[in-house]
Amino acid sequence: MYLITKVPDDITKKLDEVINKKHTEKANHDLAGNIQQEFLIPDGKPIVWPLIDKCIQAHFEKFPLYYARISGMHKTEQFHLELHSLWVNYQKKYEFNPVHIHDGLFSFVIWHKIPFKMTDEKARFPHMKESEIRAGHFVFLMPNELGHI
């Protein structure tokens, strides 16, 4: 399951301040990306966690049976969620994230500054149907209980 939401402007502004700082703690060793500049940003955790927690709680309220089935979490029980790590990818042209696995029950991505518009990307492939264009897209591969995608 996935959820799409817009990051509020106040959080975006605070996150922008964190992202624009000079970072020194590389995150590449723990990440699958073919990206040269990946840095841990622990200062961003208290900024994004309230939004992420709110989204998770809303999702959990809407789909309690799903989460009970996949994790054993039940609405009547207390449970503690924690943001383990937060990092920023300064992704350049030709860099990419290959198919990879995220551990834990929840993962999220925030696209912060995208240097192009999707309409421009789609215009690069005039010979293709719009539904067939994959460049610039983000894909979740979510297997079922039997491992089928």
What feature does the model see in each segment?
Residues 1-80, 85-97, 134:
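Non-heme Fe(II)/2-oxoglutarate
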